[in-house]
Each structure stands twice: as C-alpha cells, then as structure tokens.
Amino acid sequence: MAAAAAAAAEQQSSNGPVKKSMREKAVERRSVNKEHNSNFKAGYIPIDEDRLHKTGLRGRKGNLAICVIILLFILAVINLIITLVIWAVIRIGPNGCDSMEFHESGLLRFKQVSDMGVIHPLYKSTVGGRRNENLVITGNNQPIVFQQGTTKLSVENNKTSITSDIGMQFFDPRTQNILFSTDYETHEFHLPSGVKSLNVQKASTERITSNATSDLNIKVDGRAIVRGNEGVFIMGKTIEFHMGGNMELKAENSIILNGSVMVSTTRLPSSSSGDQLGSGDWVRYKLCMCADGTLFKVQVTSQNMGCQISDNPCGNTH
C-alpha cells in the first residue's frame, strides 16, 4: 500500500493529477471518517447505567422524608399561629410589653384589665393592687372563689360564704386587732359590730348570750332542735316561745320551770265535751304542774279526772 501510494505520488508529480475511481474515493472517505471518529471518542469508555452507584433517597426512604418535611411544615405553621396569638394578647411592641411588667423581685404587674380563668399563686404569694388604688375583681355571671386547701371564700351577687374546716379569723391589717374569730378556746365568740343576726345550720357551743340591753331571738323557718349533753338551762327576765306547730320537750329525768309560768290554752287542741273517751284511736292526757314548777302528764281515763294520782312527781303537794 505504501509502495503504491508512493508510485501514484511520483506519477502525479510527473504527469499531473491522477483521476481516482469511485471505489477508491469511497475507501478513502471511509478511512477518513473512521480516523475522525476515533479522534472524537478518544478517552471515552461506554459504561452501563444500571451498574452505576445510585445516590439520593428513593423508595420508602423518600416517602418517609416527604412525611417528615410535611410534619415540620405543620409544626412551623402552628408555632407561627401561637406566636401571633401571644403577640396579640400580650401586646408586645417596640417599647416592650404593653399589658404587663416583670420585675427582678418576682413581681408581675398587669397594666390593663386582664381576663383570666383560674389563678394559682406560688407558695406564700400575694395578690394585691397598687398603692391608693382599689383591686377590682369581677366574675362574668359566675361567683368569685378564693380557695386555699379546704378553706374557701365565695363571693356571689346576693351572698358571701366562707367554708373552713379549721376555723377563721378577721383582723385589722393596720392594728392587727382581731375583729372576729372562731377560736372559742382563746377568744369568746362575738358578732362583729354592725352584724345584727347570724344564720347557721348547726352551732355547737357552751352557751349563747345577748347584751344586757337587747333580747336574744332565735328564729327558724322549719324545726329547731336544742340539745345539751348535760342538760339545757334557759335563763332570762322573760322567756317566750312562739311556734306555728308543735313544741316538744324531752328529758331523761325531769323538766323544771322556775318562776311564774303561763301557758296559753287558746291555741292548744281540745276535744269536744260530747266525745267519748274510748272512741277512736285518740289517747288523751292532762297537763299538770307541781308547786315547784315541775310539769307532768296524766292520762285521762274518766271524766272529771284530776292530777291526784299515786305516782305523781310532786309528792303530797299538787
């Protein structure tokens, strides 16, 4: 091939250009293209893509990553809403918080009207107002309740109630003088000045007295029970019992009425004179009194029956 090319070159140079056949031109063109393609693909090595190392999150890991991103986005939106609500309620501005102040001493001061549900002060904390200003606490159609342990103070529209299992005391904060106390062993129970009546469901005490210039009135809407472990002693200049129903006196030994005793019989039930003693289910008694004021009853078994019975408590004097 080299010799033929050299001979052709010598012939072309001596006799002028030599015409090539169609086959020779095609072979020459193919060789040129092959050489060109080999130069273009120099350093290129074809590799199968399936054999390459795959990077990134694919399959289940990709789905899990998408779920985590969505969850973080939801939490970010909730955090943004809470931040906006806190900012709107507390009113944080360029000059700080417009609704409250925090002091180094631990004092939290509210500078405007605040709407709260339940307040839990810390141990030995104090809730109060500013100097020379009133502390106004208002409940929206609900009672205001102050509670510590079992002690509770409830302020309502028409009443104020205090409930305590250990007692209570009211004292002047300036003079520290006790105005009212339920510690009966140390202080005698007195109604505060200006209080005219005391409404209780049950009271346990040694004695109940009134002032020397006023009467002691005990009034009940239903039934009143006065009971003493060692007897009941009622003393006064004048003792009056007014009842709309029945009055029942019970004693283990005797009932003693000292002084002048008057019983109004106008409202006492009585049977008509024409009724027979044995008719019906009624059992009749006659009220009798001894000279010393002792009352006793005698069952009526016959007409015109008196109090002279053999076992009367008066002895020989009726």
From Swiss-Prot:
Gene Ontology CC entries for this record: cytoskeleton; dystrophin-associated glycoprotein complex; endoplasmic reticulum membrane; Golgi membrane; plasma membrane; sarcoglycan complex; sarcolemma
Extracellular side, ranges: 87-318
Glycan attachment positions: 158, 211, 258
Ranges facing Cytoplasmic side: 1-65
GO term, biological process aspect, one: response to glucose
PTM (free text): Disulfide bonds are present.
Annotated stretches, region: Disordered: 1-32
SS bond partners: 288-314, 290-307
Transmembrane segment boundaries: 66-86
Main location: membrane
Alphabetical keyword list: Cell membrane, Cytoplasm, Cytoskeleton, Disease variant, Disulfide bond, Glycoprotein, Limb-girdle muscular dystrophy, Membrane, Signal-anchor, Transmembrane, Transmembrane helix
Tissues expressing the protein: Highest expression in heart and skeletal muscle. Low expression in brain, kidney, placenta, pancreas and lung. High expression in fetal brain. Also found in fetal lung, kidney and liver.
InterPro entries, per the entry: Sarcoglycan, Sgcb
Localization in the cell: Cell membrane, Sarcolemma; Cytoplasm, Cytoskeleton
Bilayer topology annotation: Single-pass type II membrane protein
Basic and acidic residues: bias regions: 21-32
Impact upon substituting residue 184 to C: Found in a patient with a myopathy resembling Becker muscular dystrophy; likely pathogenic
Protein purpose: Component of the sarcoglycan complex, a subcomplex of the dystrophin-glycoprotein complex which forms a link between the F-actin cytoskeleton and the extracellular matrix.
Family: Belongs to the sarcoglycan beta/delta/gamma/zeta family.
Subunit structure: Cross-link to form 2 major subcomplexes: one consisting of SGCB, SGCD and SGCG and the other consisting of SGCB and SGCD. The association between SGCB and SGCG is particularly strong while SGCA is loosely associated with the other sarcoglycans.
Disorder named in the UniProt entry: Muscular dystrophy, limb-girdle, autosomal recessive 4: An autosomal recessive degenerative myopathy characterized by pelvic and shoulder muscle wasting, onset usually in childhood and variable progression rate.
Name this polypeptide is given: Beta-sarcoglycan
Lineage: Eukaryota, Metazoa, Chordata, Craniata, Vertebrata
